């Protein structure tokens, strides 16, 4: 269970660290795990052991450090809850863009809230349909592209706010040496309050340099080719 990934993603999303630190963390995991283990990591944002991701994104407070009574008294405004949904999308895009297994704790895809055990174990209920649909689109895109699941990975930062993840398969073998469909994708995440330009070195995927602009507080996955690109 890749809790270090959760901690790093949360720190970036909350503005406690920057894209350079997150890039270095992702490279560190890539370098320190054998490939079969690395591509099997359970990349999670929530579980029964921690506060739910939407709740965590509503505050910079370490909820696990609070007493049970203090946790029960926590409350958030509608604006905080709405902003947390948008930030969760950025975390989810990263979760689905990196090597490993994107693991969703039940209800997180619906925007369920909850502090620590037992308050994070409430019965499942439907909530934010838009968030559910966003997760469904991420899952469909990853399922339809071998490069996004078992392709090679390159991590880059365009600025303190913009993280980039290049995933690719050259030829007919993936990163584990198994037969796979070739392809190249670039995930770009901008946590900043303003749109940002970026340039990514995609030469490892045979796609040269790729430049673009990403809207404020948003993420996109570009499909790359040697001739051009499309989202």
What are these regions (language model features)?
Residues 78-83, 123-129:
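Short, contiguous acidic/charged loop-to-helix segments that flank catalytic cores in large enzymes
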Residues 210-231:
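C-terminal beta-strand-rich structural cap/linker in extracellular carbohydrate-active enzymes
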Residues 130, 156-201:
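Carbohydrate-binding surface patches
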Residues 1-117, 187-196:
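Conserved alpha/beta catalytic core and glycan-binding cleft of carbohydrate-active enzymes
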Residues 39, 86-89, 132-136, 182, ...:
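Feature representing long, continuous alpha-helical segments
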Residues 124-158, 218:
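Aromatic- and carboxylate-lined catalytic core of secreted/periplasmic carbohydrate-active enzymes
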Residues 117-123:
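Acyl/amide activation-and-transfer machinery of modular secondary-metabolite enzymes
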Residues 201-210:
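Solvent-exposed beta-hairpin/edge-strand motifs
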């Amino acid at each position: 269970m890749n809790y270090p990934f959760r901690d790093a993603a949360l720190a970036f999303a909350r503005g406690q660290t920057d894209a350079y630190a997150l890039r270095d963390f992702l490279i560190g995991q890539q370098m320190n795990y054998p490939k079969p283990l690395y591509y099997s990591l359970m990349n999670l944002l929530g579980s029964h052991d921690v506060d739910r991701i939407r709740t965590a994104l509503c505050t910079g407070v370490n909820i696990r450090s609070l007493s049970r009574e203090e946790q029960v008294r926590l409350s958030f405004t509608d604006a905080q809850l709405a902003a947390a949904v948008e930030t969760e999308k950025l975390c989810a895009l990263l979760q689905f863009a990196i090597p490993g297994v994107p693991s969703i704790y039940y209800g997180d895809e619906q925007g369920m809230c909850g502090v620590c055990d037992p308050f994070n174990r409430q019965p499942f209920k439907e909530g934010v349909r838009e968030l559910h649909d966003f997760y469904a689109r991420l899952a469909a895109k990853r399922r339809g592209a071998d490069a996004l699941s078992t392709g090679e990975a390159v991590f880059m930062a365009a600025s303190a706010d913009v993280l980039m993840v290049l995933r690719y398969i050259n030829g007919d073998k993936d990163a584990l040496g198994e037969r796979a469909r070739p392809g190249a994708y670039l995930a770009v995440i901008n946590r900043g309050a303003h749109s940002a330009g970026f340039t990514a070195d995609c030469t490892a995927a045979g796609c040269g340099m790729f430049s673009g602009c990403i809207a404020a507080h948003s993420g996109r996955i570009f499909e790359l080719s040697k001739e051009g690109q499309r989202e």
